């Protein structure tokens, strides 16, 4: 989903995209003009990507080219990776967003950049929603807020957009996409499971904790 849809749409729409650390080719001049690599965030690739684009450099995302990549081999490695990416993205947002909003890029680019760099803030809300599920069950069973719960049930439709996002990305790259999309509930459960880990990363990033 990230590569097939997000990166493709951002690139074609003129929005800022991020280099993912691997599978890319940089011009040496671009890196030097952007101020070289910085070590003040955990996601130096995201940081450099934005600094380069703010001074006029542009990336070209080649969707039809593939490159080998390694995935975490066990759950602790995955949690460490997600923690690093989440905390680093928050650190980068604190560092880069003031520069984005002071720049002369179009308003739509500023808004999209804000959504992009702050999207990990959703994890504390996912965690909060999970915690509140238990008391909500008892409140609902009391029968005193039927209208409220009837209206709130409409928000379940929000999951439809996530499902379509991943369904179309899998359909585009895999002939047997139906076999993969049935794992979507497992993916959502995994995202919920990472909420504690990633929420801690968000707060550490916000508090500039090293």
Mark where each language-model region is.
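Conserved glycosyltransferase catalytic-site signature
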Residues: 42-47, 186
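Flexible loop/turn segments at secondary-structure boundaries
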Residues: 17-18, 68-70, 135-138
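Nucleotide-sugar-dependent glycosyltransferase catalytic core
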Residues: 70-87, 178-181, 210
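Catalytic donor-sugar/metal-binding loop of nucleotide-sugar-dependent glycosyltransferases
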Residues: 40, 49-68
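Long helical/loop segments within the catalytic core of UDP-sugar-dependent glycosyltransferases
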Residues: 1-42, 75-107, 111-114, 118
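Conserved helix-loop functional segments at active or binding sites
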Residues: 28, 40, 65, 99, ...
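Flexible glycine/proline-rich, aromatic-decorated loop/lid segments
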Residues: 1-6, 28, 47, 54-58, ...
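Membrane-embedded multi-pass helical conduit in multi-pass membrane proteins
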Residues: 119-209
